[in-house]
Amino acid sequence: MENTPGALIAMSGGVDSSVAAYLMKQAGYRCMGATMRLYQNEDLGQCGFHTCCSAKDVEDAADVAFQLDIPFEVINYTDEFREKVIKKFISTYETGGTPNPCIDCNRYMKFDKMLAFAREHGLDYVVTGHYARIEQDPDTGRWLLKKALYGEKDQSYVLYVLTQDELAHTRFPLGGMDKPSIRALAEKADFCNAHKHDSQDICFVPDGDYVGFMERYTGKFYPDGDFIDTTGKVVGRHHGAVRYTNGQRKGLGLALGAPVYVCDKDMEKNTVTVGPESELFTTTLVAGDFNWISIPELTAPMRVKAKARYRQPEQPATVRPLPDGKVEVEFDEPQRAITRGQAVVLYDGDVVVGGGTIL
């Protein structure tokens, strides 16, 4: 048994991570299940919503672990989650961006912290229910992150932060499967969560009212301010600049005779600039905090396909290195509502080249 590889299964209580645990156990790994406690629902002023980290989720994960006859633990990472994810989420909104906290959770919690926990317990791999694939390049030896075989479920966009060490010690057993097959396996195993709904994207804001969450969490109040047009003329009043994101049309409460969209925000002046949809299109962006996966670094311009938001189809582009580790991404065609704080992820076929944060 000592030579049998060991796997720590990150179990959310959902069907995907449960089937991932099932598959690893079937493959002969020494398995241990663990659920992360990232926050207390009562601390966020929320109850009655389906979120991860709920008592029901922990119960479901524990039940599946019991069925699989594997040890199970709940790990308390509430302090780390507050510092690394929630505070960055709030600061990104307060400085005019639109964050993607799922990426930071993957970076700091699901892989960094969980891999350390696995090693402390003599386990070799972290296993999650993400839809993506990992392979090693036979020529370079680098570990590659690849898209899931079934594109509609692919989650490689939110996994671009994984390091070479993390990729070498991570397994995604669902990368070649579709959702119906996964639910069928859960039914076969008689798991209690075989038909459980998928969790919310932002688990700690289950009602979608992120400004309400920020006000409760910080004790701040985000004041009203002016809507202005692209010439600087005041055209109305808004209810706090943090409430609006680039490209937004709904919920502005403006009647200007033609549709207008959020084009920019000045957080110091608390103004929100609105204009016609044509103002939203641009061909270039600059990104920082870049993580390269298929290459060690970018030294020359490279042709790629790029995604500047999760649900966007990949677009042909050229990426160029800039000083201080930043990159410029120039799209072949203008892109709508590129937004600070979101991720841009670069692809070469089904391989993730790398990704970073839009500045």
Regions found by a protein language model. Give the residues of each.
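ATP-dependent adenylation/nucleotidyltransferase module used to activate substrates
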Residues: 1-160, 171, 180-181
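AMP-forming adenylation/ATP pyrophosphatase catalytic core
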Residues: 127-134, 138-139, 144-359
